[in-house]
């Protein structure tokens, strides 16, 4: 299964644009993503960050040992997203349960 994973507020804490390199990993993020990879899932980071933040984002992911298979930046910003395949993120324990 291919899983799109948001960056800010899911993998790491929400920070202002120019402070994103200082973000902290969300509790359980690395372990949960590693467990999903171990089950054979493909993990794509899907974020509203801009492409100019790509190198910084890749460096942050490497520094915090976050597994992923690809990155897609420039997700449209909206007040709400309607999607028939979405899982509302409330924490990594619940996300792992929802994803099976």
PLM regions: where:
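HAD-like aspartate-dependent phosphatase fold
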Residues: 1-100
């Amino acid at each position: 299964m291919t899983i799109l994973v948001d960056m800010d507020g899911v993998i790491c804490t929400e920070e202002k644009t120019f402070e994103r390199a200082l973000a902290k990993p969300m509790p359980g993020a690395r372990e949960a993503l590693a467990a999903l990879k171990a089950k054979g899932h493909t993990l794509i980071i899907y974020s509203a960050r801009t492409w100019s933040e790509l190198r910084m984002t890749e460096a942050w992911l490497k520094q915090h040992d976050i597994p992923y298979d690809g990155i897609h930046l420039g997700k449209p910003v909206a007040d709400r997203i309607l999607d028939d395949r979405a899982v509302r993120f409330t924490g990594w324990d619940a996300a792992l349960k929802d994803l099976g």
